[in-house]
């Protein structure tokens, strides 16, 4: 059975094709190009199931799916999950965070697991070795930090993260902003990981999201980078509903 998993984020949309439960291929496009890519996939692949999770504004895309006449499943607050959810306000839990924990449960059952999703925001989500989801944290993402400095000041430029090595001490405004955002976020992530390690033994750390690969080589803590962690969770949900 071929399943298409769609992660509709705030700026990008990620597609993953699963065959027999295994991820065959994945790709990511800007939200404005999602309809075109879906139409191309539908022409090339015989889709049996489409599962969809949206954290961004997906109204136009949902309308597009309905016009294509293809049935699909939408993950929402009421979608059942295979783990114990101890979040105090489950109705406000981001759908991306909810799905990420499905993958954590399936792949690391019985293990203390921290999933860090570095996207528009950086989210930290934790499940204990009893497979209970406790919650986590939400912080501004890499690009949001640059945009915030530009938006809330009169003269700071609107920058993007540099792929070059970032010095600790910025010798000009450009490099000072790069250091503040990139080194600051790295220190924040490493610091939170260290605090989790103090409280939970044998901690498995997963890093995913659009900026996950950018950050993975810069962190001092050992992490497992998996850019498809959320797509896997969507496919696991399809399998879970069949059982």
Language model regions located:
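Amphipathic coiled-coil signal-relay and dimerization helices
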Residues: 125-126
